[in-house]
């Protein structure tokens, strides 16, 4: 019986975790031109460029699909048309379904790069 169970487990295909969807609301004053997302603490960023159709500041939004296999904690790197970069470490994509850029933009004092952490 144990052997049959183990053989069945080997025969089952690996099932990928469903993706997480993150609604990004650009409430910052500058247009969002790209977002890069990586599993927290890694350099394995996957970038989505919006250069052809930027996500305009003031409330425009975009929804991105995030691979569900790497867990919940993600590092985000958002690049804006004016050259500024907003980095957010350990953002929980399981707990939060939306991200509002203006909340972190206001806290940054607006140097060229700002890093937030959850």
Question: What are the functions of these language-model segments?
Answer:
Residues 3-14:
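Sec-dependent N-terminal signal peptides
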Residues 16-71, 77-118:
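Intrinsically disordered, low-complexity segments enriched in small/polar residues
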């Amino acid at each position: 019986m144990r052997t049959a169970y183990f053989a069945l487990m080997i025969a089952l295909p690996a099932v990928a975790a469903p993706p997480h969807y993150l609604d990004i609301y650009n409430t910052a004053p500058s247009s969002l031109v790209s977002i890069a997302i990586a599993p927290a603490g890694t350099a394995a960023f996957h970038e989505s460029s919006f250069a052809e159709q930027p996500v305009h500041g003031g409330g425009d939004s975009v929804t991105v699909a995030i691979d569900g296999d790497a867990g919940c904690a993600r590092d985000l790197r958002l690049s804006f048309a004016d050259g500024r970069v907003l980095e957010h470490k350990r953002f929980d994509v399981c707990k939060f379904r939306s991200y509002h850029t203006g909340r972190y933009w206001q806290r940054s004092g607006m140097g060229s790069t700002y890093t937030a952490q959850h």
